[in-house]
Amino acid sequence: VPGLKITLLQQPLVWMDGPANLRHFDRQLEGITGRDVIVLPEMFTSGFAMEAAASSLAQDDVVNWMTAKAQQCNALIAGSVALQTESGSVNRFLLVEPGGTVHFYDKRHLFRMADEHLHYKAGNARVIVEWRGWRILPLVCYDLRFPVWSRNLNDYDLALYVANWPAPRSLHWQALLTARAIENQAYVAGCNRVGSDGNGCHYRGDSRVINPQGEIIATADAHQATRIDAELSMMALRDADEFRLW
C-alpha cells in the first residue's frame, strides 16, 4: 500500500457566513495537487455556532462544493459542517471522494459546556472510511476526550480529528492527540482552526500529524493561517503492530 499524503488546512473561519467561507477555501485549495486527503476544520462553513444549522447552507450545496474540490485536487476532501436534517441539526463530518461518493460521521460527544447538546443531535455510530488502501476513522473535536470511542480494534490506520478547540485548553489538545496515537498504535491527525469567533473564543490551531509511536511528524505554528503536509507510511504502522494492545 502506498503512503498516504495528507494536508491539513489550519485557517480562520468567517462567523456564520457559508458563502464567504467557501470562497476562502476556494483560494486555499487552488493549485493543491498530489495529495490523497485534504482536511478542513470543524464547522468550516460557520464557525462553532449553536444556531449555525438553522441558517446553514444545505447539505447538497456543501457536498456539491466538496465534490468539485475533490475532483479539482484528486483527493478526499474532509471537514465538518452544521447541517439541518430531517431528524434534527447535526455536526456532520463529511468526507467526499473525487468520484462523488460521500461518507459522513455525526459527532458523537457534544460539548455540553457550550450547550451543543441542546442544539444538535448526537450521532451514535462509528464510521470507517476506506480510501486508497487506508482505513480512516473520522472524529470531531470533543470526541478526543473519550478514548473508548476511538479504541482501535485493528479496524483503522488513521484517526482524523477536526476541531474548533479553544486556545486556553490547547495543552489538552496536544497531549490527547499524542495519547490517542500511542494507545491505539495508529496515525492521528488533528486539524484545528485559528482566529476568533463570534462568541469571543480564540483558537491557536496547533494542527498536527502524529505517528503510531507518538512522534509529531508535522505541526502548524500556533495562531498562523497555514497548511501542513505529511506522508503516512504503512511500514510504520506494521512496525507498531508487533505489539498490538487490544
Residue ranges with predicted function:
Residues 84-154, 168-175, 233-246:
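Active-site catalytic loop in hydrolytic enzyme cores
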Residues 7, 94-96, 103, 208, ...:
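Conserved hydrophobic/aromatic positions in well-ordered beta-strands
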Residues 60-78, 145-225:
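CN hydrolase (nitrilase-like) catalytic-core segments centered on the catalytic cysteine
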Residues 46, 94, 105-111, 208, ...:
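Short beta->alpha transition motifs characteristic of CBS
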Residues 10-15:
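Short polar catalytic/cofactor-binding loops
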Residues 18, 23-98, 103, 167-180, ...:
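Cys-nucleophile CN-hydrolase/nitrilase-fold catalytic domain and related Cys-dependent amidase chemistry
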Residues 36-37, 136, 158:
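Structural motif
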Residues 1-8:
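Extreme N-terminal starter segment of soluble prokaryotic enzymes
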